[in-house]
């Protein structure tokens, strides 16, 4: 899956942005269209994430991208104290969550819980974070044109 960088063209925030690699690029292409998709084996139909060339279940190299509902639940979370990078110092109380997808419980994505798609990373009171809380994906276009999935509480 993609690594991260501290700067992208047109970005002056210093926040970490995805750097798509060959296997993960379709994930980000679909995100740019507002779709949450996960790589699926074309032979055994097993989902896999992070994306990779070979199916870990049947070793097939044939794959496609299956659309997900965008719903899930918080499987885990962390509140970094203090913020680990300088650009995040202005965002005290931001979170990083791990979401277990509703239709694929073995697939877990890392992201941020926000109050609205374009809200800052620290827009949700940390006291509202709960393991098992239902969430749904929203998509945010960041400076530099990169679109990332973030998460909002399904029942705020």
What are these model-predicted stretches?
Residues 89-109:
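OB-fold (S1/OB) nucleic-acid-binding surfaces
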Residues 49, 62-64:
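Short functional micro-motifs and their immediate structural scaffolds
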Residues 35-38, 52:
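Residues immediately within or flanking Cys/His clusters that coordinate Zn2+
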Residues 77-83, 104, 140-142:
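Short, conserved beta-turn/loop elements at beta-strand boundaries and strand-helix junctions
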């Amino acid at each position: 899956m993609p690594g991260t960088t501290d700067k992208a063209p047109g970005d002056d925030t210093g926040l970490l942005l995805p750097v798509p690699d060959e296997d993960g690029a379709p994930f980000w292409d679909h995100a740019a269209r507002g779709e949450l998709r996960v790589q699926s084996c074309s032979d055994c139909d097993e989902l896999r994430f992070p994306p990779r060339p070979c199916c870990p279940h049947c070793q097939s190299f044939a794959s496609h991208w299956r659309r997900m509902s965008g719903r899930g639940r918080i499987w885990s979370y962390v509140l970094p104290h203090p913020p680990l990078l300088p650009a995040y110092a202005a965002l005290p109380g931001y979170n990083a969550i791990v979401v277990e997808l509703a239709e694929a419980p073995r697939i877990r994505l890392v992201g941020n819980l926000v109050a609205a798609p374009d809200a800052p990373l620290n827009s949700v009171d940390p006291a509202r974070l709960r393991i098992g809380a239902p969430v749904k994906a929203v998509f945010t276009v960041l400076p530099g044109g990169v679109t990332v999935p973030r998460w909002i509480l399904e029942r705020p």
